[in-house]
């Protein structure tokens, strides 16, 4: 087995998947990375297969998807696997980010890993939006029209940029072609960023752990211990995903998208996929178009400032009760935003959306630094009392 350590390619695999020393107290919350990698592989394989039968033209896109569903051998399975794994991908990413926020994975020396992860999240959202347009149902067309129109909020040149993106004066053949090309290419860019994410993690301090202390005191090799641990959650994931694919494949979709796109008829409500709803709610809660767009993008990118705003001395919230409370309030608020994004723009949803948006941004900009300062002060007071 000496070749595993001497061969230039095998030694890389060995360093990352076999001999990689991991803290011995990792919980199952550290399994999301392998699950997300598994999702990306599924998406690339099923996506390339679907692309072999898809026709990116306004007149044939919807029919080609129907052809995949009805005529291609197991085409229904490939398509449902692709669409449901996309939802699973985002669900797991949100859990992965939530775990990172709770356990302080953004703190030095893992700041670069956190930053690359945020870029991956933004690129995932862009890729998902492009893919949602491709079946060219009603929600595809009108979703594409609404979201690309956000670029018109850019002063002076906005409308020109929108028409440049469309390749015409509305969503047309050129739009569908370029969206298909980008949707095909971006997952491979995503895979490259995932490798960078891994390299940044391994070349700094490796994985964190639930205690937030140095993991150097007790480590175990990745194989066989953590490979087996990852396989448990991968098999559980396959079971849950199979239940969705075989028993309720359309539960996370929108019924409007099973109607061929009609530019002359607007759907009753234009709603994106569930995983983009919190940011859609933030966009709609601000009356000004430009400020709404800025707020929506800021809501995604704001997690990058966590290494600066978290002034706590310990990594993670395990031993910080006040921060724990604020974290769970933040999670509840995020779920409220998700629900509000699916509702019509009317009272009281507008007011609730504005309150939730203020709470969302104040969590990162005001609550986190303030609560961490209070906790630091309480610790100092306790230490002074014990010394005296």
UniProtKB/Swiss-Prot annotation:
Additional facts recorded: Heme 1 (or BL or b562) is low-potential and absorbs at about 562 nm, and heme 2 (or BH or b566) is high-potential and absorbs at about 566 nm.
The record's GO CC annotations read: mitochondrial inner membrane; respiratory chain complex III
Name the record gives this protein: Cytochrome b
Give TM segment ranges. 32-52, 76-98, 113-133, 179-199, 226-246, 290-310, 322-342, 349-369
Taxonomic source organism: Zymoseptoria tritici (Speckled leaf blotch fungus)
- Any idea what job this protein has? Component of the ubiquinol-cytochrome c reductase complex (complex III or cytochrome b-c1 complex) that is part of the mitochondrial respiratory chain. The b-c1 complex mediates electron transfer from ubiquinol to cytochrome c. Contributes to the generation of a proton gradient across the mitochondrial membrane that is then used for ATP synthesis.
- Name the InterPro entries on file: Cyt_b/b6_C, Cyt_b/b6_C_sf, Cyt_b/b6_N, Cytb/b6-like_sf, Cytochrome_b, Cytochrome_b_C_euk/bac, Cytochrome_b_N_euk/bac, Di-haem_cyt_TM
Return the PROSITE patterns for the record: CYTB_CTER (PS51003), CYTB_NTER (PS51002)
Q: Which family does it belong to?
A: Belongs to the cytochrome b family.
Enumerate the residues binding heme b b566. 96, 197
By its UniProt entry, which Pfam families does this protein fall under? Cytochrom_B_C, Cytochrome_B
Listed under subunit, the entry gives: Fungal cytochrome b-c1 complex contains 10 subunits; 3 respiratory subunits, 2 core proteins and 5 low-molecular weight proteins. Cytochrome b-c1 complex is a homodimer.
Where it sits in the cell: the answer is: Mitochondrion inner membrane
Q: What keywords are assigned to this protein?
A: Electron transport, Heme, Iron, Membrane, Metal-binding, Mitochondrion, Mitochondrion inner membrane, Respiratory chain, Transmembrane, Transmembrane helix, Transport, Ubiquinone
Cofactor: how and how many bound: Binds 2 heme b groups non-covalently.
Cofactor(s) needed, names only, are: heme b
Binding sites annotated in the UniProt record for heme b b562: 82, 183
Q: Which PANTHER family match?
A: CYTOCHROME B
One GO BP annotation is:
mitochondrial electron transport, ubiquinol to cytochrome c
């Amino acid at each position: 087995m000496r070749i595993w350590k001497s061969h230039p390619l095998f030694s890389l695999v060995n360093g990352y998947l076999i001999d990689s020393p991991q803290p011995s107290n990792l919980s199952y919350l550290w399994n999301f990375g392998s699950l997300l990698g598994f999702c990306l592989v599924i998406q690339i394989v099923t996506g390339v297969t679907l692309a072999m039968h898809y026709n990116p033209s306004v007149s044939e896109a919807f029919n080609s998807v129907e052809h995949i569903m009805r005529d291609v051998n197991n085409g229904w399975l490939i398509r449902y696997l692709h669409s449901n794994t996309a939802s699973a991908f985002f669900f797991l990413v949100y859990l992965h980010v939530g775990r990172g926020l709770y356990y302080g994975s953004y703190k030095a020396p893992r700041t670069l890993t956190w930053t690359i992860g945020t870029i991956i999240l933004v690129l995932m959202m862009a890729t998902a939006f492009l893919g949602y347009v491709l079946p060219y149902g009603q929600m595809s067309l009108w979703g594409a029209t609404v979201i690309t129109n956000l670029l018109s909020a850019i002063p002076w040149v906005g409308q020109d940029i929108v028409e440049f993106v469309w390749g015409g004066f509305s969503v047309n053949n050129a739009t569908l072609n370029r969206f298909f090309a980008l949707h095909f290419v971006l997952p491979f860019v995503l895979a490259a960023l995932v490798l960078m994410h891994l390299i940044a993690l391994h070349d700094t301090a490796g994985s964190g752990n639930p205690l937030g202390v140095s993991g150097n005191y007790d480590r175990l090799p990745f194989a066989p211990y953590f490979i087996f641990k990852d396989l448990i959650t991968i098999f559980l994931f396959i079971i849950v995903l199979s239940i969705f694919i075989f028993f309720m494949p359309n539960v996370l979709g929108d019924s409007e998208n099973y109607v061929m796109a009609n530019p002359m008829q607007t759907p009753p409500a234009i709603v994106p996929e569930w995983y983009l709803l919190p940011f859609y709610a933030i966009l709609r809660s601000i009356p000004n178009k430009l400020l709404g767009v800025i707020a929506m993008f800021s809501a995604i990118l704001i997690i990058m400032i966590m290494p600066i705003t978290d002034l706590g001395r310990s990594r993670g919230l395990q031993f910080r009760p006040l921060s724990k409370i604020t974290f769970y309030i933040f999670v509840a608020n995020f779920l409220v935003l998700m629900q509000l994004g699916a509702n019509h723009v009317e009272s009281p949803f507008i007011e609730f959306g504005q309150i939730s948006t203020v709470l969302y941004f104040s969590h990162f900009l005001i609550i986190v630094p303030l609560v961490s300062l209070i906790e630091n002060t309480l610790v100092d007071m306790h230490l002074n009392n014990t010394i005296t």
